[in-house]
Design a protein with these regions (language model features):
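Membrane-embedded alpha-helical bundles of multi-pass enzymes
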Residues: 1-175
């Protein structure tokens, strides 16, 4: 259990550090989801409760939110805590759906769902009244706009797709 928690923390920290402009570690975003993907696979192989995937995704995205949007506390501490919590609750959902798809339908469909769920969630996050558009995966390159001049054609969602696919490729290369 502690090992699984460590992988959640690692994924959250890698994601968070890939957004920090001061150190410009954006390449970390290309491997940040790999520990979570490994963790999800362990939960699936060990036939553990699917709720564990949700809990671990919540840990990943709580850390990610705290590292990237810590500055919200300057406005109000309670507002920051609510933003951290509710954003993590929502972002964990597509990762849980990915796990359920893998578990009940199959691996291939699960990995397709992984891509679709994340991109669909990001689209919904842009277009609902409580929009929180700061943290799509494609925004990891904000400190290096020269890397993403092609966003002119694809938007940030193209960058998110890039990040998701590279994480999957790295994961399959490691596993």
């Amino acid at each position: 259990m502690l090992k699984r928690f460590g992988f959640s923390v690692l994924s959250g920290v890698l994601l968070g550090l890939s957004w920090v402009e001061i150190i410009n570690f954006f390449p970390l975003v290309f491997v940040a989801l790999v520990p979570f993907l490994w963790l999800e696979n362990q939960i699936l192989q060990q036939k553990l409760s699917s709720a564990k995937v949700y809990v671990h995704a919540f840990v990943v995205f709580s850390l990610f939110n705290i590292i990237t949007t810590w500055w919200i506390y300057h406005a109000t501490l309670s507002g920051a805590l609510m933003a951290f919590f509710f954003s993590a609750v929502l972002v964990a959902f597509p990762f849980w759906l990915y796990h359920l798809t893998r578990k009940h339908i199959g691996n291939k469909e699960g990995y397709v769902a992984f891509v679709i769920n994340i991109l669909a969630f990001e689209w919904l996050d842009y277009n609902w009244p409580l929009s929180h558009p700061w943290l799509p995966f494609g925004n990891a390159f904000a400190s290096s706009p020269n890397m993403v001049q092609w966003y002119e054609y694809t938007g940030v969602s193209g960058g998110s797709l890039w990040v998701i696919l590279v994480n999957l490729i790295v994961y399959f290369g490691v596993v």
